[in-house]
Amino acid sequence: MEDRQALEEAGEEMGFPVVNISGGGRGRRGNYSNDGSGARELSLRVNEEVTEPPYNSITYAEVLRLYRQNGFSFFLSNLHFEQIKYFEHREGEGDLGAIIREHGKIVLDPNVVYHLRRPLKIQSLCYIVGRGAVIKVHASVGQQAVHVYRQLDISPRIMGMLNVTFLECKFHWADDEGVNFERLARHFTLFFLTYESVFFACDFVGFPGLTLRSTCLLRVEGCTFTSCAVGIHHADVADLKVKACYFNHCSVCIFADGPADVLRNCATNCDCFVIMEQEGSVVGNSVVYKLPPSRADDLMICQQGYMYPLSSIHIVRNLSCEYPKLKNNVFSHVDMHVGLRQGLQHFNQCNLSFVYCMLETESVPKVSFYSSYIQTLTVAQIVQFSREHSRECQCFCGGRHRLLFPSVVHITPTVVPDRTRFTVDVEELSDDE
């Protein structure tokens, strides 16, 4: 009884509403009787206006203490992001992982360069505001720099802090002497995400291997990827959302092995912009130029026993999925690969300039360029694979395979619509906004 009373008093000091739902015992307003007055009093208590803690008034450590004492009380209270005190972390103030576990809401100093030399494990909800601070990830960190996961009931759910969030952080790769870079690059992962995460306005510069590897719901918005081997690798039934990001000099920007929405991004001088293995949408993107031949790698992808050279926009063969939605994109000086799927593949209001599109044989009647803005387009159909000409290439699965070069025939006149027969003054080519 004394412990419960102490807990209620501590909750009142923090500003949490304390409700006695037992109908008896001692609450904040005295004793309740069993004649029904307790139920009436409870109804009045629930409907009255609750006084919430003011801005920046509660430390995350205090919230954890109360949560561990009585986790059920958090179902009866409203706790928001702005009420949590932020902790200003400066270099040399302790281990970052321990600080995240203790404080949750952390603000970095933009005038300090932070260094990550040991693997970091994030196992609770957190919100990290970088304010443009640079975090250098050293090669000595090993094959996995940051592992994000959440243990059950280790932290409460706070409105506005429902995910692991990184805001305005700049992650830079730093080589270390004595580290086998080639071996590390094949297996390196900057972020291994197994809990819902958000990256907002972050920079990633020069990372080998996988920059963001996710097996859960992931949102990447307003971020920049520069000289990264693979920007985003998503493999889960949960959705991936990549919005308003910029990719420059990356080998592979987005590999979506699950539902994905790729919206209003820009990619320049990248070998592959997106690999779509499941359904999704690619809307409002601008993809210009591939990597120059001197810097490009011979990349390929294997799927269901088929092996193809990797293209800038690669729609993987998948008989159980429909084609992704492509609309309002600008593709210039790139190539595309369209595999066999269900339904039809339309390039609605897409600008195709100096584009080479390679179609698998079965997918030829399923592709339509009727609603596209065709500047310079070459369409080729794969007829067979030549056994006389082959090359060993690096596959996206991590191994190396011998790729047989496809033999193609150009079918551009048969798939490009005859504009003398079809007018452009139609709804499919008009602006619907």
UniProtKB/Swiss-Prot annotation:
Entry's family note: Belongs to the adenoviridae E1B 55 kDa protein family.
Domain commentary: Contains a PML interaction motif that allows the subnuclear PML localization.
A cellular-component GO term for this protein: host cell cytoplasm
The protein's name: E1B 55 kDa protein
Pfam families named among the record's database cross-references: Adeno_E1B_55K
Localization of this protein: Host nucleus; Host cytoplasm
Gene Ontology terms: biological process: symbiont-mediated perturbation of host apoptosis; symbiont-mediated perturbation of host ubiquitin-like protein modification
Organism ancestry: Viruses, Varidnaviria, Bamfordvirae, Preplasmiviricota, Tectiliviricetes
Record GO terms (molecular function): ubiquitin-like ligase-substrate adaptor activity
The organism of origin for this protein: Murine adenovirus A serotype 1 (MAdV-1)
Keyword Ribosomal protein: no
Keywords: Early protein, Host cytoplasm, Host nucleus, Host-virus interaction, Modulation of host cell apoptosis by virus
Function: Plays a major role to prevent cellular inhibition of viral genome replication. Assembles an SCF-like E3 ubiquitin ligase complex based on the cellular proteins ELOB, ELOC, CUL5 and RBX1, in cooperation with viral E4orf6. This viral RING-type ligase ubiquitinates cellular substrates and targets them to proteasomal degradation: TP53/p53, LIG4, MRE11-RAD50-NBS1 (MRN) complex, ITGA3, DAXX and BLM. E1B-55K probably acts as the substrate-specific adapter of the SCF-like E3 ubiquitin ligase complex.
Assembly notes: Interacts with host PML-4 and PML-5; this interaction promotes efficient subnuclear targeting of E1B-55K to PML nuclear bodies. Interacts with E4-ORF3 protein. Interacts with E4-ORF6 protein.
